[in-house]
């Protein structure tokens, strides 16, 4: 068949080198004549197609004719008898044909005979039995030959096999080969064909077949194993398949081999074919034609079907190394040139058209084409031309620089410009021009950044059932569109989406859900743009706990040992670290409790400590870093015979509590140590003093055993033996035990107490006689009880009924140091001996401890009556450790960078708890050290620091925030200043207005609100305190509603006065009730002092705190609406009144208190001026910048 040419060609056929038939004009198809014998047409054909431009020639066609295959008449085969295990061959021998038929072995119902390792078919159609079984007996083995080209199936005569039982003693048969015969065979195969090697064995048991290649490894990609490994097939054979192959057939009896020598040759095939072009007169034409084959083919040339001889008369033509060279071509050289390659396996022919013509040059590639590429790629700039002679083109960069001057740039034979490994500097305009013409085109090259994966997927180890996330981070040139990210697993595309149950793709990352073993593999991320792509991959290794161990076996079964073995587990990508042997001693594996017996690292273990008369069930688990496997699918059981006990019970002892009996006890033996039925404990005992006496014995099933009438604390020899129905254990060890103990009869004598230090004494005694202990002497107990402190008054003495301190000492001790006693206290001490029954009589002794230095005093908040005075207050030490004789006060001025002189004041009155220091520097702080004194010396000092308070002053800087009918006034109180009373005066700046004045205000209050002002009016404000005054102006906010609405009666003066009177009356009634309720009450501090102080000290404290109560009563009589009166009353009292309001002030860890003076009150004080009143009813919330009430500045500094 030829490509159609213009003008239309004529066709003629040549058969076996001679003209065959007439010349055909319309079609080259050759049709046989129906009356002619087909055998007449058998031969080798070649077709010639010719027109004005030349003659083309076809490849050789070989036509073979043959009659339709048919079966010859044959005699019916006799039924053949075989023994079980013998081999057999049923031969097909189909009619011969040029095309091998396909063979089907079937029965009479057209069911295929099953093929397996034992029953195999060969390429020649024979049916082979490696060994026969009884089921192979049948009468309808039929070979059906299917001729596909003839479309017929020829069934041969059925064959019969009868299989009888074997009488042979030998049960197995050695392996050998049915087909092929011998030890070696050779095969010749052509390149591109299919090679099939057969290895059909016989033997019992059925042999296994294994294929190998001698000279190299057998490639799994190039070979296929068919018919249960009996055929080895290689499709599309290559020269590399040439070599030696071997088949090994093996069963339990032996192995047999067959070697195959495969030789690969090849019919001719093209490696280079000539190209068709248009040529101009005078050009040189080179037609290059190369072919390969085994053996190497011979190449010849023809022109229009006429061979070119080696001595061509035309000197312009010559053949060299398969090339046909035409020099200085003319129009008459237009023709079809044939190149033909021939070897013994066939021939191939190719036609090449040479057209000599003159045509003007043209550029076929469009102008202004843009080429985009990424760095590192190769760019091909097209410049396709047409013309004869062939146009000569050249390239320039920016219309001036020759392109070929760049080492990276080359020009192909078709005129294209090749730029290799492009970079950013290659981004330019390139011009292609045709020489000796004005024709040219331009092309632009734009080089972009490469697409690059900067964060490739990582290799992950994932536990089965969890999720895995593979990240793929990349960079792309901003001039390119968003890339596509494609994930692949083992080279196959993954379709990921948010709706996919397995794969989710999130911003380029791949999430694999619920990872299973089949998800393990190589995952690659491919980032693609319109210009380039990049690929990176990572591996997901799925880990899981191991599979259960397999093939659990018990071997070497002995009376007391057994060997356990098993097949190792599948590790599931995490190495097995150990195997756990579990044991169950129930009657069945479902009964009892599975327990861990031991862990081992290998897959075998010997257990050599099995108990007799026991049943064991075993199972194995494998352990890796992920977890523990399920147990082996089935457990194994092992029972041991009964035997005498091997051991006796341990820890035999006496646990007697009754003086006239003995309890013998021991540690019960494990049931597995019984070793047989009828297990009991046999207990023996006799007095230790009568070592030759007869043993008394008793048998019991479990401990303990009680022996009566033994006497008090008598020693016995005791032993316990294990017995069962098969006998007794070895002779047990004898131990010494005792009957029950009784209380000791005597107390330790010669008890004495000697003072070592002021708070420790040495206690000595004489030990009790051993016979009086009536048991094992466990030691002595010293009971220490404090009767009271000598410095306490009789009414406040500590009771001695509390629990005493108990000190135990060992039995061999005769003295003991008792420490940590209290100073100046009375003690009672007793001592007794004790055994396991209890304590004996006590010996008693009394003693006292001397005085010691007092404990520290407790500083209370102190006051500053003036700028140069401080009054200190304190409580007496909680532990005086003697009689307090007075106090030592030391103080000094705090001077930074230097040491100031220290002042000392000795206070010789023990009942005094306050002291006033005068003539202090108001500008300095002081440190105070106060110690209590008794006859033993001075106690540890309490340390406090502080400074005096300065005189108060009214605020000079006020922050004002005006509203419609009020103004908020706030200020910052001075540091260390006393509270000072003052008031605000304010005046409307209108004609005829009069001054108004607020109530009295505390300087420490920090906030006040003037109410009842007119809207939109300017006011003048003054602060008055003594002869001091400060002035300000402010304006309230204008409110149209306030000016429009009539004055409500609630704002009238008479109504406000009425309401104020009612509120005042109610408050007076409440205060009277409170005063009546608290009348005669005592201050809690006084109650505390009454419980600890003496009568002389009590009188002074009652007088002092009486003043405090007077102040409190006076304050209660003050109205909340009259703070100025309260302030006046308070300031007229002495300094102790300020102390009364400061009892809640706290102390720091170093002893200094936080709110130091009454001028800085605790928020719970009683004299706050910020209480709601008819004049000042709405207090604003606290501010972080300024205190908003009097309580805001009374707290800690």
Curated annotation (Swiss-Prot):
Instruction: Tell me which residues make up the Ig-like C2-type domain.
Output: 1-58, 69-160, 165-263, 268-355, 360-442, 451-541
* Alphabetical list of SMART domains matching this protein: FN3, IG, IGc2
What Pfam family is a match for this entry? Bravo_FIGEY
**Keyword set includes Repeat:** yes
The ranges of region (Disordered) come to: 630-655, 1115-1135, 1154-1197
Q: Where in the cell is it found?
A: Cell membrane; Cell projection, Growth cone
So which residues have sugars stuck on them?
135, 149, 221, 298, 414, 421, 438, 449, 708, 959, 968, 1002, 1027
Where do transmembrane segments lie in this chain? 1055-1075
Query: Compositional bias (Polar residues) spans?
Result: 630-640
Q: What PROSITE patterns would the database entry show?
A: FN3, IG_LIKE
Question: The organism sits in which domain of life?
Answer: Eukaryota
Residue intervals on the Cytoplasmic side: 1076-1197
| Every Fibronectin type-III domain range | 548-643, 645-742, 747-852, 853-952, 953-1048
Q: Report the SS bond pairs.
A: 92-143, 199-247, 289-339, 383-432, 472-525
The membrane topology noted for this protein in its Swiss-Prot or TrEMBL record is: Single-pass type I membrane protein
GO molecular function list: cell-cell adhesion mediator activity
- What keywords are assigned to this protein? Cell adhesion, Cell membrane, Cell projection, Developmental protein, Differentiation, Disulfide bond, Glycoprotein, Immunoglobulin domain, Membrane, Neurogenesis, Repeat, Transmembrane, Transmembrane helix
In what tissue types does this protein appear?
Answer: Expressed in postmitotic neurons in 16-36 hours embryos, including those in the brain, cranial ganglia and otic and olfactory placodes, and in all classes of spinal neurons.
The similarity comment for this entry is:
Belongs to the immunoglobulin superfamily. L1/neurofascin/NgCAM family.
Instruction: Provide the function of this protein.
Output: Cell adhesion molecule with an important role in the development of the nervous system. Involved in neuron-neuron adhesion, neurite fasciculation, outgrowth of neurites, etc. Binds to axonin on neurons.
Question: What's this protein's name?
Answer: Neural cell adhesion molecule L1.1
Q: Which gene encodes it?
A: nadl1.1
């Amino acid at each position: 068949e030829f490509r159609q040419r213009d003008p239309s060609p004529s066709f003629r056929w040549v058969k076996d080198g001679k003209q065959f038939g007439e010349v055909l004009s319309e079609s080259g198809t050759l049709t046989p004549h129906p009356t002619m014998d087909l055998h007449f047409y058998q031969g080798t054909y070649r077709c010639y197609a010719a027109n004005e431009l030349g003659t083309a020639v076809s490849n050789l066609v070989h036509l073979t004719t043959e009659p339709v295959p048919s079966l010859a008449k044959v005699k019916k085969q006799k039924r053949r008898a075989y023994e079980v295990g013998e081999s057999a061959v049923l031969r097909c021998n189909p009619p011969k044909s040029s095309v091998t038929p396909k063979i089907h072995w079937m029965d009479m119902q057209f069911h295929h005979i099953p093929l397996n390792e034992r029953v195999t078919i060969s390429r020649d159609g024979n049916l082979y039995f490696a060994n026969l079984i009884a089921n192979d007996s049948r009468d309808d083995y039929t070979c059906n030959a299917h001729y596909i080209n003839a479309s017929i199936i020829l069934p041969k005569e059925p064959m019969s096999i009868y299989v009888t039982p074997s009488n042979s003693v030998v049960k197995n048969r050695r392996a050998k080969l049915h087909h092929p015969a011998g030890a070696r065979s050779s095969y010749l195969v052509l390149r591109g064909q299919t090679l099939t090697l057969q290895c059909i064995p016989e033997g019992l048991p059925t042999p296994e077949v294994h294929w190998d290649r001698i000279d190299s490894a057998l490639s799994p990609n190039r070979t296929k194993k068919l018919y249960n490994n009996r055929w080895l097939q290689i499709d599309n054979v290559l020269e590399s398949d040439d070599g030696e192959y071997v088949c090994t057939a093996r069963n339990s009896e032996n192995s047999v081999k067959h070697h195959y020598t495969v030789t690969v040759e090849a019919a001719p095939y093209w490696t280079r074919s000539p190209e068709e072009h248009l040529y101009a007169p005078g050009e040189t034409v080179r037609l290059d034609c190369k072919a390969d084959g085994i053996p190497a083919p011979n190449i010849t040339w023809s022109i229009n079907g006429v061979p070119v001889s080696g001595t061509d008369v035309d000197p312009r033509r010559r053949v060299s190394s398969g090339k046909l060279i035409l020099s200085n071509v003319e129009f008459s050289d237009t023709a079809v040139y044939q190149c033909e390659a021939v070897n013994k396996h066939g021939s191939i022919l190719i036609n090449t058209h040479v057209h000599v013509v003159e045509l003007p040059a043209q550029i076929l590639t469009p102008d202004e084409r843009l080429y985009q590429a990424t760095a590192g790629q190769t760019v091909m700039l097209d410049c396709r031309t047409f013309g004869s002679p062939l146009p000569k083109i050249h390239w320039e960069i920016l219309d001036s620089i020759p392109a070929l001057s760049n080492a990276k740039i080359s020009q192909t034979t078709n005129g294209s410009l090749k730029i290799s490994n492009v970079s950013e500097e290659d981004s330019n305009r390139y011009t292609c021009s045709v020489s000796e013409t004005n024709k040219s085109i331009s092309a632009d090259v734009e080089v972009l950044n490469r697409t690059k994966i900067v964060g490739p997927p990582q290799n992950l180890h994932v536990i089965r059932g969890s999720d895995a996330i593979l990240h793929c981070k990349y960079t792309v040139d901003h001039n390119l569109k968003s890339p596509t990210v494609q994930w692949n697993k083992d080279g196959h595309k993954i379709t990921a989406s948010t709706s996919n149950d397995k794969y989710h793709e999130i911003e380029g990352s791949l999430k694999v859900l619920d990872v299973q073993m089949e998800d393990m593999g190589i995952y690659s991320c491919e980032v693609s743009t319109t210009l380039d792509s990049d690929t990176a991959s990572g591996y997901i290794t799925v880990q899981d706990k191991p599979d259960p161990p397999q093939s659990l076996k018990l071997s070497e079964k002995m009376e007391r040992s057994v060997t356990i073995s098993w097949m190792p587990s599948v590790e599931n990508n995490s190495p097995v670290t150990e195997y756990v042997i579990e044991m169950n001693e129930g009657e069945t594996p479902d009964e009892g409790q599975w327990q861990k017996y031991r862990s081992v690292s290998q897959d075998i273990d010997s257990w050599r400590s099995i108990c007799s008369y026991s049943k064991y069930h075993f199972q194995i688990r494998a352990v890796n870093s992920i977890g523990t496997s399920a147990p082996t699918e089935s457990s194994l059981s092992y029972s041991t015979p009964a035997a005498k006990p091997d051991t006796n019970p341990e820890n035999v002892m006496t646990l007697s509590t009754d003086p006239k009996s003995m309890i013998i006890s021991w540690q019960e033996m494990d049931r597995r140590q019984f070793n047989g039925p009828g297990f009991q404990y046999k207990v023996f005992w006799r007095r230790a003093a009568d070592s030759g006496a007869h043993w008394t014995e008793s048998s019991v099933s479990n401990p303990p055993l009680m022996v009566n009438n033994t006497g008090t604390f008598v020693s016995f020899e005791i032993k316990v033996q294990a017995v069962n129905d098969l006998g007794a254990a070895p002779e047990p060890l004898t131990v010494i035990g005792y009957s029950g103990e009784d209380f000791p009869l005597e107390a330790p004598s010669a008890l004495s107490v000697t003072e070592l230090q002021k708070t420790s004494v040495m206690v000595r005694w004489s030990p009790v006689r051993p016979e009086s202990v009536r048991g094992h002497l466990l030691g002595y107990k010293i009971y220490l009880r404090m009767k009271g402190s000598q410095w306490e008054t009789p009414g406040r003495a500590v009771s001695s009924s509390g629990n005493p301190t108990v000190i135990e000492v060992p039995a061999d001790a005769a003295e003991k140091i008792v420490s940590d006693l209290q100073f100046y206290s009375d003690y009672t001490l007793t001592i007794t001996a004790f055994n396991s029954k209890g304590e004996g009589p006590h010996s008693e002794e009394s003693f006292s401890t001397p005085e010691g230095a007092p404990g520290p005093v407790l500083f209370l908040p102190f006051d500053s009556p003036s700028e140069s005075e401080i009054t200190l207050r304190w409580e007496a030490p909680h532990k005086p450790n003697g009689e307090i004789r007075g106090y030592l006060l030391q103080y000094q001025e705090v001077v930074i960078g230097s040491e100031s002189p220290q002042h000392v004041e000795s206070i010789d009155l023990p009942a005094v708890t306050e002291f006033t220091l005068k003539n202090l520097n108001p500008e300095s702080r002081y440190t105070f050290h106060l110690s209590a004194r008794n006859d033993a010396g001075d106690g540890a000092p309490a340390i406090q620091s502080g400074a005096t308070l300065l005189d108060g002053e009214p605020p000079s800087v006020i922050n004002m925030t005006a509203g419609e009918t009020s103004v908020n006034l706030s200020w910052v109180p001075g540091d260390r200043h006393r509270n000072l009373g003052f008031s605000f005066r304010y005046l409307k700046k209108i004609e005829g207005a009069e001054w108004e004045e607020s109530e009295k205000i505390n300087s420490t209050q920090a906030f006040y609100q003037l109410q009842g002002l007119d809207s939109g009016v300017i006011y003048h404000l003054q602060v008055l305190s003594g002869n001091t005054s400060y002035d300000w102006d402010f304006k309230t906010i204008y409110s149209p509603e306030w000016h429009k609405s009539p004055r409500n009666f609630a704002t009238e003066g008479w109504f406000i006065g009425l309401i104020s009177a009612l509120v005042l009356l109610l408050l007076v009634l409440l205060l009277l009730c409170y005063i009546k309720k608290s009348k005669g009450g005592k201050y809690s501090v006084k109650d505390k002092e009454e419980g600890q102080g003496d009568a002389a000290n009590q009188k002074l404290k009652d007088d002092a705190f009486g003043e405090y109560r007077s102040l409190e009563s006076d304050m209660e009589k003050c109205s909340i609406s009259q703070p100025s009166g309260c302030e006046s009353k308070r300031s007229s009292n002495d300094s102790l009144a300020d102390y009364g309001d400061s009892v809640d002030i706290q102390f720091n860890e170093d002893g200094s208190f936080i709110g130091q003076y009454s001028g800085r009150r605790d928020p719970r004080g009683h004299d706050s001026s910020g209480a709601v009143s008819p004049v000042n009813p709405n207090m604003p919330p606290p501010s972080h910048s300024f205190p908003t009430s009097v309580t805001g500045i009374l707290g800690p500094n």
